Amino acid sequence: MAGGPHFIRKNGWVDENRPTRVLLLGSTGSIGTQALEVVAANPDKFTVVGLAAGGANVELLDRQIRETGVSSVAVADPSAAASLARPGVLSGPDAVTELVRTTEADVVLNALVGSLGLEPTLAALESGARLALANKESLVAGGPLVTAAAAPGQIVPVDSEHSALAQCLRGGSADEVDRLVLTASGGPFRGWTADRLESVTPEQAGAHPTWSMGPMNTLNSATLVNKGLELIETHLLFGVDYDRIDVTVHPQSIVHSMVTFTDGSTLAQASPPDMKLPIALALGWPHRIAGAAAACDFSTASTWDFEPLDSQVFPAVDLAREAGKGGGCLTAVYNAANEVAAQAFLDGIIRFPRIVRTVASVLSEADEWSAPPATVEDVLAADGWARERARQLVKQEG
């Protein structure tokens, strides 16, 4: 595996004689709230030492502060921070990164949404804490900067698919891996024609068939951009070539990923769709947390279906593969262009299929960004260029 996996470690960073200290970034989002439930259910294993949020849900954040008793808090929105009326709250665009640098934690769970999580991710790695990574965009955007900053085993994925791969890879060595297989539910529009997608509304795109997620992740799942991001994340985490990473549609979302080994055997990780399982595993890695989620019930009849992805109707995965192979900052361009186009759809400016078309158009003009980034500023420059170009294309569409 080129570059080597960044998650495999036989012992963790933590002192097992005391609860693991968790710093939670993105505490008011879907992953963040579920992580707090995992912590609350296991007070002998985990304790929260800090919270960070964007500021969109101040009432929830205030309640979380009261319930956890933390004094280390960061809020990106200064007005939201002021409304908390609590002393010592860090605020502003650099507040979350500052919180990471000034809070002693064993595990930093980055559940922020979007590429704004890049600098907190790098700060967490620099601190020496284990990084439980739900913010896939920071890895996709930062690419080699993130993997170079990580010690072996320092990054543990929270995404269910990558958590599944990490578990399956315990069953073999790196040189025995033939292919990695990511599963996708297919989203709410599985089986739809391209023409039918023209009429999709934001409300329809926000109804995921099997998972409960935040609005942007749900939309990204509907376009299959989320699976494209996960494809890139898989390559970066596990060092497997893009041509050896497959995507298959599995509507039930029970099998989360599979690993095929060179002897022809395939290991799969299966569990009912519940993010508390990969969250608990990432917080406690390499140990499992008893009762983290319900298990599969094999006493009743059930069917697990697998089918090929229709890449003609949903080209986002192929685009991600091309961006990844292109190298440099092209994956950052892919992510940034999507964030702009996806928001434009949610705002009613463009139609649903135009999201991925905008990403494709921006990538087609992005050859100058194929050089490997030397600094965070290089990534931010590519990100900024892609956002501006996507805005121009969206404006033309509108």
Swiss-Prot record:
Per UniProt, the enzyme's principal EC class comes to oxidoreductase
Respond yes or no to whether keyword Metal-binding is given for this record.
Answer: yes
Its organism's taxonomic lineage begins at:
Bacteria, Bacillati, Actinomycetota, Actinomycetes, Mycobacteriales
What PANTHER family does its record include? Answer: 1-DEOXY-D-XYLULOSE 5-PHOSPHATE REDUCTOISOMERASE (PTHR30525), 1-DEOXY-D-XYLULOSE 5-PHOSPHATE REDUCTOISOMERASE, CHLOROPLASTIC (PTHR30525:SF0)
Give the binding site residues for Mn(2+).
159, 161, 230
> InterPro entries under this entry?
DXP_reductoisomerase, DXP_reductoisomerase_C, DXP_reductoisomerase_N, DXPR_C, DXPR_C_sf, NAD(P)-bd_dom_sf
Task: Please name the GO terms of the biological process aspect recorded for this protein, alphabetically.
Answer: isopentenyl diphosphate biosynthetic process, methylerythritol 4-phosphate pathway involved in terpenoid biosynthetic process
| NCBIfam families recorded | Dxr
What's the short name of a Pfam family annotated to this entry? Answer: DXPR_C
Establish whether keyword Ribosomal protein is in the entry: no
Q: What is the official name of this protein in its record?
A: 1-deoxy-D-xylulose 5-phosphate reductoisomerase
Pathway assignment reads: Isoprenoid biosynthesis; isopentenyl diphosphate biosynthesis via DXP pathway; isopentenyl diphosphate from 1-deoxy-D-xylulose 5-phosphate: step 1/6
Detail which positions bind 1-deoxy-D-xylulose 5-phosphate: 136, 160-161, 185, 208, 221, 226-227, 230
Which cofactors does the annotated protein need, by name? Mg(2+); Mn(2+)
Which residues are listed for NADPH binding in this entry?
28-31, 54, 57, 135, 137, 214
- What is known about what this protein does? Catalyzes the NADPH-dependent rearrangement and reduction of 1-deoxy-D-xylulose-5-phosphate (DXP) to 2-C-methyl-D-erythritol 4-phosphate (MEP).
Q: Which GO terms describe its molecular function?
A: 1-deoxy-D-xylulose-5-phosphate reductoisomerase activity; manganese ion binding; NADPH binding
Source organism per entry reads Rhodococcus jostii (strain RHA1)
**Which reactions appear under catalytic activity for this entry?**
2-C-methyl-D-erythritol 4-phosphate + NADP(+) = 1-deoxy-D-xylulose 5-phosphate + NADPH + H(+)
